[in-house]
C-alpha cells in the first residue's frame, strides 16, 4: 500500500539525512585539517 511505502521511505531517509550530515561534518573537518 502507499502508506507502507511512505513510512518505509521516511524511515529510510531519516538515517540517510543523518549520515549525509555526518559526512558533511567530516568533510569540513578534513578540509580544515589540510588547510
Curated annotation (Swiss-Prot):
What role does it play?
This major soluble protein in olfactory sensilla of male moths might serve to solubilize the extremely hydrophobic pheromone molecules and to transport pheromone through the aqueous lymph to receptors located on olfactory cilia.
UniProt name for this protein = Pheromone-binding protein
Q: What interactions and quaternary structure are annotated?
A: Homodimer.
Family of this protein: Belongs to the PBP/GOBP family.
Tell me the GO molecular function terms: pheromone binding
UniProt GO BP? response to pheromone
Q: Which UniProt keywords apply?
A: Pheromone response, Pheromone-binding, Transport
Top-rank taxon, per record: Eukaryota
The species this protein was found in: Orgyia pseudotsugata (Douglas-fir tussock moth)
Q: Which tissues does the record link to its expression?
A: Antenna.
